[in-house]
Amino acid sequence: MRLISLVLSLILFFSCTEIQDDPEGSSSDKPNVILIMVDDLGWGDVGLNGNVKVKTPHLDQLASKGFRLSRFYSAAPVCSPTRASCITGRNPNRMGIPGANSGHMLKQETTLAEIVKKLGYRTGHFGKWHLGTLTTQIKDANRGRPGDSSHYSIPSMHGYDSYFCTESKVPTFDPLIKPLAFDTAKGESLRYGWAAALENQQEVEDYGTWYWSGIEKRKLENMEGENTKIIMDQVLQFLEGDKDEPFFATIWPHTPHLPVVASKKYREMYAEYSHAEQLYYGSITAMDEQIGRLWEYLERTGKAENTMLWFCSDNGPENRTPGSAGPFRERKRSLYEGGLRVPAFMLWPEKFSGGEELDVPMFTSDYLPTILDLLDEEGKIPELPLDGMSVREILEGKVNERGKPMGFMHRNGAKSWVNQQYKLISPKKDAPYELYDLLVDPSEESDLISQSPEIGAEMKTKLEDWLRSVASSKEGKDYP
């Protein structure tokens, strides 16, 4: 009897010791989290939204396994601001990032990477950064200059253990170089793109935007070929790290942001189309293959079931490109639907069976509160004015409407307020307000402002309250 009591005491002791050592539960039980955001991909540029030209089989398949988010919005109609919203849950104007190549991620902001790192996650960022300069020693990209630290803000300042990224855009093939001359007869140019230069033995020079993987550490080796493959090579190295820790990765490929460059392999997939379409569609298919490669790795290594993956674009398609906004009005840089509504899906096989379309408004500012809620870490949501909300109950099928409206603004003075049904918009500075019923008129063709002035007035009051809140944040009043 004494021996049995001793054994039971030892079992109880070691059980209690385990609980004391890991009061919040094993970090290995936490899901991996991946946020993929591509660049300038229009709502209509993917098969999952009905495009029959562009080949995106991997994106289509992943969307079919999860939730297709058919009313998903970027927080802004351009690049940098949307990126800021993804990792803070806040409108980018609150932190002084009103447009591309303006402002930078502030140290006072609390990012999703910082929060999950404290929860035991390994954190990595890959691809485009666009939230600050990455060097103070050499000329780089749009704003990096020797001796200039005014916008120096690298991922490791904001919770990332590892990173491999550029300040801004690069060509979508052979990202570090550009040809000395372009085939202008085919419409090639430095701005819009070209066929892979080295395939034709063209003379080349540095493009002028570099990849960085540490403080003043440029990556110059193994930088040839498909840009998204180069990025994914680094992602997979990161994922091969400590197997006992969950990972959080933001993967932001540059495709199909200009200049679009495609190799012969991908151009030939679209031989029946124009040269511009071959470059544009080819770059998207190349990117799609690499996202498929990522998921295949996760399945092969047994990580896929417990990985939460989100996919979206940072804004609508660029003007004067083959990009498609689908049935929606206007494109990038506009607060009409075509500038903000983007292709998106989410899957987490272990938790959600998926296979559904969710026709509920969501946007990139929802990422932070939603992910922390799904991790059962709502208490870690920053006590700052957030513009996003947790959409966990929508994903779980408990509610089918958005409870918190979404505010939008752009540096040209445009502003907008969107709820479950209606959209109020002033499309540029001092322009009169327009009102659309997005449930019956998603293409924004019938302005209802004169028919429903009371709805417009109520939404205008809420929009103006929100704009005052954003202005207060921009003045630094959110920070101690």
Which ranges hold each PLM region?
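Bacterial N-terminal signal peptides
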Residues: 5-13
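Formylglycine-dependent sulfatase
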Residues: 2, 16-433, 438-480
